[in-house]
Swiss-Prot record:
Belongs to the protein kinase superfamily. CK1 Ser/Thr protein kinase family. Casein kinase I subfamily. SUPFAM superfamilies: Protein kinase-like (PK-like). ATP binds at L15, G16, S17, G18, S19, F20, G21, D22, I23, K38. It is found in: Cytoplasm; Cytoplasmic vesicle, Secretory vesicle, Microneme; Secreted; Host cell surface. The lineage of its organism: Eukaryota, Sar, Alveolata, Apicomplexa, Aconoidasida. This is Casein kinase I. It is an enzyme of class 2 (transferase). It comes from Plasmodium yoelii yoelii. It comes from the Eukaryota. The keyword Transmembrane does not apply. One of its GO terms (cellular component) is cytoplasmic vesicle.
Length: 323
């Protein structure tokens, strides 16, 4: 039986699950256009879909921000219909054998910085910068990196007065420990600097293949967070960025030098990485490491579909001849 949302979208296959609920593909029953549908139980102890839908509305119109087409409650579920995107940078990283070239990292960093700056310009911080929350588009937007998942985002300043939230300590870790800034580990209220520092760790993860604080054995979540923090603090920026360009050392040192209310100089950081891009003689051609691999995976799928279709036709023709 076909399940419909808002009497307009036919629910298809499940794409994934999260702490909030499930994500499905859906088709507009008239245009047959595909969308992503997020479902959250109305009995959820920590509902976040309403909050996230409001965030998408505030961020609406931004480059690389998914558009929300419908939000509401049907039956036992809170539902949000939004743009269907391609795989995440984490998925593509795995597809590329868990290592990105310097060229891909720099082209990716440029777009990711733009997305983070845009979110900040709308008075919010993301608080969960990680490869899983950056997705490529589909079709004509396959080279455009999108930022998603605003369930943990927080307003860091007043929309009108631009008064910054106060400095606080003793906060629990919000986000993903692997990429969290040192100040976040120390329990300090997050601000713009923390999103930028987290991006620095994402870039090193892409370049190195892993981070020194991955795979630490722990007896509890708190113990794991503590061990990650200890390793992160004890690993100097120079050691972390060993065998990479000095620009990454400069990037992370800059992030760590920012004060709580400081506005990061996004232009300076982009220029820093663009200068490295130019010095290496790269061309900004939007050909990422995954471009050929991802395309060939899709081609393989199409070939398999065509082969199956051909086999079916041949089978039918065979039956006709036998009859």
């Amino acid at each position: 039986m076909e399940i419909r949302v808002a009497n307009k979208y036919a629910l298809g296959k499940k794409l994934g699950s999260g702490s909030f609920g499930d994500i499905y593909v859906a088709k507009d029953i008239v245009t047959m256009e595909e969308f992503a549908v997020k479902l959250e139980s109305t009995r959820s102890k920590h509902p976040q879909l309403l909050y996230e839908s409001k965030l998408y509305k505030i961020l609406g119109g931004g480059i690389g921000v998914p558009k929300v087409y419908w939000y509401g409650i049907e039956g036992d579920f809170t539902i949000m219909v939004l743009d269907l995107l391609g795989p995440s940078l984490e998925d593509l990283f795995t597809l590329c054998n868990r290592k990105f070239s310097l060229k891909t990292v720099l082209m990716t960093a440029d777009q990711m910085l733009n997305r983070i700056e845009y979110v900040h310009s709308k008075n919010f911080i993301h608080r969960d910068i990680k490869p899983d929350n950056f997705l490529i588009g589909r079709g004509k937007k396959v080279t455009l990196i999108h930022i998603i998942d605003f369930g943990l985002a927080k307003k860091y300043r007043d929309s009108r007065s631009h008064t910054h939230i106060p400095y606080k300590e003793g906060k629990n870790l919000t986000g993903t420990a692997r990429y969290a800034s040192i100040n976040t580990h120390l329990g300090i209220e997050q601000s713009r600097r923390d999103d930028i520092e987290a991006l620095g760790y994402v870039l090193m993860y892409f370049l190195r293949g892993s981070l020194p604080w991955q795979g630490l054995k722990a007896i509890s979540k708190k113990d794991k967070y503590d061990k990650i923090m200890e390793k992160k603090i004890s690993t100097s920026v120079e050691v972390l960025c060993r065998n990479t360009s000095f620009e990454f050392v400069t990037y992370l040192n800059y992030c760590r030098s920012l004060r709580f209310e400081d506005r990061p100089d996004y232009t300076y950081l982009r220029r820093l990485l663009k200068d490295l891009f130019i010095r290496e003689g790269f061309t900004y051609d939007f050909l990422f490491d995954w471009t050929c691999v991802y395309a060939s995976e899709k081609d393989k799928k199409k070939m398999l579909e065509n082969k199956n279709r051909f086999d079916q036709i041949a089978d039918q023709e065979g039956r006709v001849k036998q009859n």
